[in-house]
Amino acid sequence: MRLGTQTFPGHSRRSPLLAFALVLFVLFAAWKISEYIVAGQTGNLFLVGLGFAVLVLVVAMLNNWRNGLYFFLAWLLFEDLARKYLGNNMAIYFGKDFLVTVVYLSFFAASRRKEIQIFRPPFLIPLLLFVWFGVIQVFNPASSSLLYGVLGLKLYFYYVPLIFVGYALFETEGDLRRFFSINLFLAVLIAGLGSAQAILGHTFLNPEHPAEDIRELSQLYRVAPISGVIIYRPTSVFVSDGRFASYMILAWLIAFGVGGYLLLRSRRGRLLASLILAVISAGVILSGSRGAVLWTAGSALVCAAAFLWGAPRRQGEALRVMRSIQRSLLVGGLAIIIVFLAYPEALLSRVAFYSETLSLDSPHSELVYRVRDYPLQNFLMAFTYDRWPYGFGIGTASLGVQYVSRIMHVPPMNIGVESGYGSIVIEMGIVGLALWLIMSFAVVFACWRIVRRLKGSPWFPIGFVIFWFAFLLLFPFTFNGLQPYQNFVLNAYLWLLVGILFRLPTLEISAQNTIAGGAAMPRRRWIR
């Protein structure tokens, strides 16, 4: 008997059935596609193609959760672009949640096979307390529907497991380089498109007839109070200018941290990293967002001082870090000069808007009001609601409540303030705010302890910018508004980057591309 001709029971019966089913599927797909083409329904045709692509991605993600994570991040960043051109389709909106669920399932299967490392976050107890209280708030009697609670749980906690994914993501230094290379490529693409849109106006990268829900978000112009110049606030690949501006802050921090890492590790890639930082800096300036400009400028000062403090204690290392900071400042200045030479009107109009609304000498300065008075007033407004001790329920004042009310026909709550801390009080009462502050402090403090352990190592610049991003998002950003934390891009990157931060002390440094006389890692210690 020859093994090559051996057949198995049922094989001869199943193959014709599978072939017949495949033929039927192909014929049905061809029929539907031809219908869409004849009817001119290109949107439906695009959805069919997108669905098929997602199916292929799911199979690949189940086989390799690390590649699946990169697919998820790419979808996360470019999902809004599809939403804009498909009439704000809610099926597209939930695509990222489906993909991250596939990542979780694949990751869980790998953990069951003992293929990955799992760690216990030192802030796990404060985090679980806040999660427990959030689950209880789903059943708050003041909430008009449990669907608001489901929305709140998703916005607050759905991406928290990414911390474990981030911790297990890297096995070698090459994995780290790959992760940040991919993310910087996506960031420079988004920044470049946003800069082009700032110059060309809202007709670029936006549909001719956007959906009613997102029309105003994609066509927002601001007027300088003195000169009267009009500037457009670009959205790039996102549906709103605020999401683009907040992503630019994150992208700038990542680019600055990776640049510091390359300074201590390798001469390769420094020039490219500087060019990426220049493009992102131009995106920040052209975003038209005063918050993005101020937070990026402040972060540059803080990170520069931190890099000097965390430089390796070797002869000449502090000088090299100082030169790197000077190079970064020169790159930022070069980006401004290039934009000025190429598109002077686009730059000067935004400079006029920034100076007329932020300069303390300007009669129309809003700096003190927007930084101190307005957020504080909105926070105190939360205590004018009679249920401030108990709240109305998680999700009742969150991002996206209008979709729950409209699509699911749920009675609107009509509550909320712009302050993020105030929104937490409205949703979960004063106890919820206290638990949020405890959790936030625990997360940031744990991150700071890791950063101190990284002092003197090549990982320090990356570690510090992750710590700084976590601090900004959990404290000042959320105090001003709940939207930054509930922004799915910032939320997903927060927990993913925190997991990466906790992995850095145990990540081995490869001998490849090491600068002669470069810094050595401190003694390896495992996180428990």
Walk through the language-model features, giving the residues of each:
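Loop-to-helix entry and N-terminal half of a specific, functionally important transmembrane alpha helix
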Residues: 270-281, 445-480
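Juxtamembrane membrane-water interface segments that cap and precede transmembrane helices
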Residues: 81-87, 222-238, 370-375, 409-423
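Hydrophobic, aromatic-rich transmembrane alpha-helices
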Residues: 49-63, 100-113, 251-263, 431-454
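N-terminal hydrophobic segments of proteins, predominantly signal-anchor/transmembrane helices
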Residues: 58-88, 94-157
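A membrane-periplasm/extracellular boundary helix in multi-pass inner-membrane enzymes
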Residues: 192, 197-204, 287, 292, ...
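Long extracytoplasmic/lumenal interhelical loops at the membrane interface
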Residues: 349-352, 356-428, 447-454
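Alpha-helical transmembrane segments of multi-pass inner-membrane proteins
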Residues: 131-138, 180-310, 337, 525-527
